[in-house]
Amino acid sequence: MAPQLLLCLILTFLWSLSEAESNVFLKSKVANRFLQRTKRANSLFEEFKAGNIERECIEERCSKEEAREAFEDNEKTETFWNVYVDGDQCSSNPCHYGGTCKDGIGSYTCTCLAGYEGKNCQYVLYQSCRVDNGNCWHFCKPVQNEIQCSCAESYLLGDDGYSCVAGGDFSCGRNIKARNKREASLPDFQTDFSDDYDAIDENNFVETPTNFSGLVPTVQSQNATLLKKSDNPSPDIRVVNGTDCKLGECPWQALLINDQGDGFCGGTILSPIYVLTAAHCINQTKYIRVVVGEIDISRKKTGRLLSVDKIYVHQKFVPSTYDYDIALIQMKTPIQFSENVVPACLPTADFANQVLMKQDFGIVSGFGRTRERGQTSNTLKVVTLPYVDRHTCMLSSNFPITQNMFCAGYNTLPQDACQGDSGGPHITAYRDTHFITGIISWGEGCAQTGKYGAYTKVSRFILWIKRIMRLKLPSTESSTGRL
């Protein structure tokens, strides 16, 4: 009996093992439904499958061409690839003031909203001197990431840090129209004296009375042959078809007169001591005196006659070409300022080049001839003339236009400076302040079609002027009497 019981137990154990195996192992057909292995690339039809960015570039390293096949869009490919290669440069949000960042390989690009600029859109446009002069009324200078405004001499910088208001009754560049506007009292300011141009030799001046016969200009060609007089640029240039300048509207105008009492050149009042004029005016007479405040030389009611102490002619003046055509006249006694006698403001070089000379028009005035070969004018004339771009200027002229010159005038409209106006002011107004920008120098005739007036470019000589003007400060002596 015992052997039979043992046999039954063994058979029962073997049956239970077979049942367990059938529960663990599936038939191959069933098992393959669950245990299929995904194949990668190199299959027969792999290249015919649509691109998949995960299959192409996430599971394995891919090329840009493979990424393009997956996206089938160049812009999406570029966006993906820039991040894929070296990470997202825009993750730190580098663009300020709402700028939009676009990632690149090793770099990024910010697209700024209106009113901002810079690599990271970090600059507000009004904080750039290149845009509307930084909103400064006079001079603008970049300081780190901001701008600093300053004002011309005798002006005060406003509490807003931008505006400039006259600090006295007769501040420079204020004619009667500007003075009629409301003014305010503002805190002190600092003027920028950082310009760096030609140096001045302190001993380089001509005292009056002097015989100027040694300065008679000769115009020569490259082979040293004397040109005909009719081929010369006209040195006594230059206001045709202008209007009368009313009392107080051109208060910086000066008139140079000879020993016969005749006016022959103009000038611009810069300070109580100094008048700016053209170098070529100095060789035209033995004696020079200066009249200021006059608008009608036939009536002689408003002007003052001044004696000259010294004359500084630029040491590089070239009589044959009128290059460096600039001189400063020093008065023996200070000019007394009034509503009719006010200096023009002296700009900084940057302000003149980047702001003033990019205005549409300048203002020219003088007592010169009202037409070519006509009589000189008894009344002060003024005309508004457009700036002419340098390329057009050079093409129009038969004579050299150097870096120290610029052109102004109309191509066809008969308005111009003319003979007798030489040395006079070319003024540019900016925010109701008038700055000296040029000296009437020369031209080919007066108001001729296709010809423009040539002017000495004052911005090239700012430091030269300032250094001379520092040689002598105004004294307390009174000016000479009326005409």
Curated annotation (Swiss-Prot):
Residues 41-86 form the Gla domain. Disulfide bonds join C57-C62, C90-C101, C95-C110, C112-C121, C129-C140, C136-C149, C151-C164, C172-C345, C245-C250, C265-C281, C393-C407, C418-C446. One of its GO terms (cellular component) is extracellular space. SUPFAM superfamilies: EGF/Laminin, GLA-domain, Trypsin-like serine proteases. The modification 4-carboxyglutamate is found at E46, E47, E54, E56, E59, E60, E65, E66, E69, E72, E75. GO terms for biological process: blood coagulation; induction of blood coagulation in another organism; proteolysis; venom-mediated blood coagulation. Glycans are attached at S92, N211, N223, N241, N283. It holds the Pfam family Gla. The keyword Protease applies. InterPro entries: Coagulation_fac-like_Gla_dom, EGF-like_Ca-bd_dom, EGF-like_dom, EGF-type_Asp/Asn_hydroxyl_site, EGF_Ca-bd_CS, GLA-like_dom_SF, GLA_domain, Pept_S1A_FX. The active site is at H280, D325, S422. Inhibited by SERPINA5. Its EC number is 3.4.21.6. GO terms for molecular function: calcium ion binding; peptidase activator activity; serine-type endopeptidase activity; toxin activity. Keywords: Calcium, Cleavage on pair of basic residues, Disulfide bond, EGF-like domain, Gamma-carboxyglutamic acid, Glycoprotein, Hemostasis, Hydrolase, Hydroxylation, Protease, Prothrombin activator, Repeat, Secreted, Serine protease, Signal, Toxin, Zymogen. Residues 1-20 form the signal peptide. The keyword Calcium applies. Residues 21-40, 183-238 form a propeptide. Belongs to the peptidase S1 family. Snake venom subfamily. The two chains are formed from a single-chain precursor by the excision of two Arg residues and are held together by 1 or more disulfide bonds. Forms a heterodimer with SERPINA5. This is Coagulation factor X. It comes from Tropidechis carinatus (Australian rough-scaled snake). The lineage of its organism: Eukaryota, Metazoa, Chordata, Craniata, Vertebrata. The gene is F10.
